[in-house]
Amino acid sequence: EIMINGTDHIFLEKAGRIFESDRRFVSVAKLEDVIQQIAAGANRYVNEASPIVDARLEDGSRVNVVLRPVALNGPIMTIRKFPKEAVTMKQLIDWGSISQEAVNFLKILVESKYNIFVSGGTGSGKTTFLNALSDYIPKDERIITIEDNAELQIKGVSNLVRLEARNANLEGEGAVTIRDLIKSALRMRPDRIIVGEVRGDETVDMISSAMLNGHSGSMSTGHANNPMDMLHRLETMMLMGIELPLIAIQQQIASALDVIIHLGRLRDKSRKVLEITEVLGYENGRIQLQTLYKFQEEGMEDGKIKGTLMKENEITQREKLLAAGYSETGIHGGSVQRNSDHGDDGLSVL
C-alpha cells in the first residue's frame, strides 16, 4: 500500500509494516499532475468540484484520491497494489493466519453451498481471504462476481462473469450500482453470486434475493468488529433499502446466512482468522449464534503473536452437508465423510 499525504509525506506498507519513504514530490502542482494522469488513465475525473474518486488501474491496483478543499493539507492519494498471483489458502496456513483443520472444514462448507460472510476491520484481509476461499467452489459452476472495484482473482472457473460498479459521470448520470448489478446477476442464471463487499442498501438484494432465492453458496464481506456486530450492521444496511419491521429483517438474515468468518489484524500487524461462527436461526427475539472455532492467544515469540484456532463446537445445521453427499454417520462420528457414490471418501473435518 502506498499512502501519499501531500508532497512531503509518503508512507509504504509492506509485510504488515508501515514506514516513511525518503521520496518527495517537488511541488503540489507536480503531485496534482500525477493524480490527473492516473485518474484520466482510469477514465475518472477529479477536481475541486468533485474532489473524491476511486479507481482501478490496468494492473488491478486500487486508487483513492482526495483533493482540496476536502483534503486540508493538500492532495491525498492511496494506492493499494495486489500481488500478480492471488494468495492461496496454503499460503495463509503457512503464514499462521488459519489452521489446516479449519481450512478443511471451510472447504467442505463451500462445496456444500453454505452461505458465507467474511467480516473484519479495515486491512484485516477480507478480500484476500474471500478470494482464497472461492478456490474451493466446484469448477463446473456458473459464478458471478460483483464489486465496487474489481479485486477478486478467481482462477480455474471458465463460466465466470465479472461485474464492476460504475460511478456517475460529471452530469450525475450513468451510475451503475452494486444493487443494479445484483438485480441483473439474478437474471443470468448464476449458481453462486459473490459480492466483494456490502456497504449499503444493496444488502437487501444480497440477502433477500440472492441468498434466500435459490443461490446457495453465495459469499460476501463486510466491515465489523465481531460476528454479532456484523449482524447488527447488516440489519442497519437492510433498513436503508427496505421498509420492514426489524424482526422481519432479522429473520431474513438468520435464514440467509449460514456461517460468519471473522478476521482481525492483531497488534503485531499479523492477520488471522479470529472466529468461525454458525448462524443458528432466529429465536427469543434475536439471531442465535454458535462459535465453531475461536483463536486463543498463547503469548509472544520473536515479536509475533502465537496462538491456536481452537475448535469449540460441532456445526449444528447439517442439511446442506447431507444434500452434498456427506454421511450423517461421518458427521456425528467426528469427521465428515462423503458417500462413496459422490467420491472424496474420508474427508476429515469435524
Describe each model-derived feature in a short phrase.
Residues 123:
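Walker A (P-loop) phosphate-binding loop of P-loop NTPases
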Residues 4, 9-112:
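P-loop NTP-binding catalytic core
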Residues 115:
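Walker A (P-loop) ATP-phosphate-binding motif of ABC ATPase nucleotide-binding domains
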Residues 83-94, 131, 135-183, 230-234:
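P-loop NTPase switch/communication element
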Residues 118:
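Hydrophobic anchor at the beta1->P-loop junction of P-loop NTPases
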Residues 269-350:
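NTP-binding/hydrolysis catalytic cores, primarily Walker-type P-loop NTPases
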